[in-house]
Amino acid sequence: MLSRICGNGIRLTRTRLQFQPSIVTFRDYSNPAPKRGFLNNLIDNVRDEMQKNKELQEHQQQLKARMQELNESDALKDARKKFEIVEKETLKSSEVVKQKIEELSDHMKKMVHEIQKTEAGKKMTEAGAEALKQARKAAEHVEKVAEKVGDTEVYKHVSTSMKTVKDEIDNIADVRMYSRPEALTKRTDGFDLEKERVVEANDSATDVTLHKDSKWYSGWKNFSESNTYYHKLLDWKIKYDESDNMAVRMMRGVTEKIGSVFSGQNEVSEVLTEIHKIDANFDKQEWLRFCETKIIPNILEAFIRFDLEVLQSWCHERAYTQLSTVVKEYQKMHFSTKDSRIIDINKVEMATGKMMEQGPVLIISFQVYMINVTKNADGKVVEGDPDNPKRINHIWVLCRDVEEYNPALAWKLLEVHMQETPLAL
């Protein structure tokens, strides 16, 4: 209710009316849909499945007809003939591959058995057997590869067979096991692979002065005695390589890269450049492989067998004096090292180099695993242990004879350093 007073004193009153709408509810009453019975649902399901099966059969018949058309086409017939020809040729090739791998496996087994048949090999304890474990594993691996080649898809599917054979061959391509040479080779005898590559002097590219062998060591001696890096190399290189610590092994890859900044890599580059002036086809990795398979085995085996003639062929006067003195002293006392056996040669690396007045000098380091035994005339062990292999770290100084243009004959041992350490198992 609202009110107000007018000017004449009369009060006017107005009342506001409010209406409340009423809520009307409608309810729909209808009959529920009748429920389908079990039998009706079953009939509908059977009808749907029959319809789907009919469509499936139609699609299957269409696919069969299409495959029949493709199978009878001339293009597919020609492709099938070519496939059969390739498959036959691949089977022939796989047989050859399998045969070659089996031959390699037999060769490696014979090498291991040769060591085991020796007197030192028969007396080997668990420590000695462990030293040959890697050799046996390599032989067993090759044998398994041969079996895998026979069982792979070579005999079933050409596309997969060719890849399988390639992968298996790649896996064993880098297997290098030391094989003891039956007959030693002098440096002057040369090697077949290198005799074909005779290099002639390049007078316009090099000004290297030619000198006699007697001047070789005098120049090297002056350098080695005054060079502190060389002395440090002899010390830390041996200690670093002989470490079996996990952290040290992980760091080797890093230090090899960083070391090139602080070590004599610049001098090595200079030496390699000068070598290329004499031998344009010189390759560092090929040369290290030549050292591993030719130079090192012949010198070490000649030292073990007391073959002074072969030693003298490979060594300059200084290195020959070092090695021959030991041999001659042993011969005077009727000592023998014939039961010593080299098991493996590895980690052949180029440590540094130096360009001397007489020519290029390269220093290599490597490790030798061997049974190192010295016996007297009565067959008793006077030095070494036939039951425990040793790891011997080597640092060799090799010089190139610039008067010799045949690379197979040009390299001689100038100086040798050895340090024997027990094999850590």
Swiss-Prot record:
Subcellular location field: Mitochondrion inner membrane
Keywords of this entry: Coiled coil, Membrane, Mitochondrion, Mitochondrion inner membrane, Protein transport, Transit peptide, Translocation, Transport
One Gene Ontology term from the biological process aspect of the record: protein import into mitochondrial matrix
GO-annotated molecular function: protein-folding chaperone binding
InterPro entries, sorted: NTF2-like_dom_sf (IPR032710), Tim44 (IPR017303), Tim44-like (IPR039544), Tim44-like_dom (IPR007379)
Pfam families on file: Tim44
CC terms in the record's Gene Ontology section: mitochondrial inner membrane
Coiled-coil regions listed: 38-149
Quaternary structure and interacting proteins, as annotated: Probable component of the PAM complex at least composed of a mitochondrial HSP70 protein, GrpE, tin-44, tim-16 and tim-14/dnj-21. The complex interacts with the tim-23 component of the TIM23 complex.
UniProt family annotation: Belongs to the Tim44 family.
Job of this protein: Essential component of the PAM complex, a complex required for the translocation of transit peptide-containing proteins from the inner membrane into the mitochondrial matrix in an ATP-dependent manner. Recruits mitochondrial HSP70 to drive protein translocation into the matrix using ATP as an energy source.
Protein's name according to its UniProt entry: Probable mitochondrial import inner membrane translocase subunit tin-44
